[in-house]
Amino acid sequence: MSQKHIDELSGVETTGHEWDGIQELNNPMPRWWIWTFYVTILWAIGYAIAYPAIPMITSATNGYLGYSTRAELQQDLNLAKSSQTEFHDLIAAKTVEEIDADPALRKFAIAGGASAFKVNCAPCHGSGASGGPGFPNLNDDDWLWGGDLNAIQATISHGIRFDGDTDSHSSEMPPFAGVLEPIQMKQVAAFVWGLTNTPSDVGLAAAGKQVFFDNCAPCHGEDAKGKVEMGAPDLADAIWLKSRGEDAILRQVASPKHGVMPAWAARLGDTTVNELTIFVHALGGGT
């Protein structure tokens, strides 16, 4: 048997360990601590009986109380949905102009539209709706297909160049690589860039004016401010959808790229489309 070590000062048995002359007393645990430990064991057993706790092969024990966090969540969702039913019904039934004119409905629609935007639109247009190369900035006042409430609603509902919707906006700029000479494409690129910036070659830009009038003005207008009815962009506002610079313009003239936006009406429904319309219009660029 091992010899017991007794502390001379207190008369209490020690653990037998010593660190730099310091010994640890082997006092028993307090009674209250022991009873607390027993209570926690009983509480754990009771919890395992009352609540889902024990994992099985394909499921788990349901517990005596039948509690479920998923059921609780569904109950909360149903409660939240029922409290919003009146607003949702009104938003689905009214026109976007009527919604925008009603302060309470407009506030509710903007909140709902912001939520729907983050889920459905932000992957392309960005969380702040500022867009990116090939994806329009929705905060400015430059709109290919119109920026009033009805125009925004139509674009969201039917999309752009979306094959699954016959009412989708559709416009295509033809490739001019086989129509114009290389020098002519450089001239018109310099001219377009020169509308808002200093062209790299003033002579090229001057010659490109006539090339523009002959080939581009029918869609973009003689003033190069675009035509909403055709989805032709304004080339005189220094806002660029694809990228900036004469080289970028030259590439677009030679072999244009066309973006596609899905039609959201069938996927989201009238209520969410109307909410998105109000939200996008309220970003600041709506006309």
UniProtKB/Swiss-Prot annotation:
Principal subcellular localisation of the protein: membrane
BP GO annotations: oxidative phosphorylation; proton transmembrane transport
Subcellular location field: Cell inner membrane
Positions contributing to heme c 2 binding: M173, C216, C219, H220
Stated role: C-type cytochrome. Part of the cbb3-type cytochrome c oxidase complex. FixP subunit is required for transferring electrons from donor cytochrome c via its heme groups to FixO subunit. From there, electrons are shuttled to the catalytic binuclear center of FixN subunit where oxygen reduction takes place. The complex also functions as a proton pump.
Assembly with partners or alone: Component of the cbb3-type cytochrome c oxidase at least composed of FixN, FixO, FixQ and FixP.
Protein name, per record: Cbb3-type cytochrome c oxidase subunit FixP
Species whose genome carries this gene: Rhizobium etli (strain ATCC 51251 / DSM 11541 / JCM 21823 / NBRC 15573 / CFN 42)
Lineage: Bacteria, Pseudomonadati, Pseudomonadota, Alphaproteobacteria, Hyphomicrobiales
Gene field: fixP
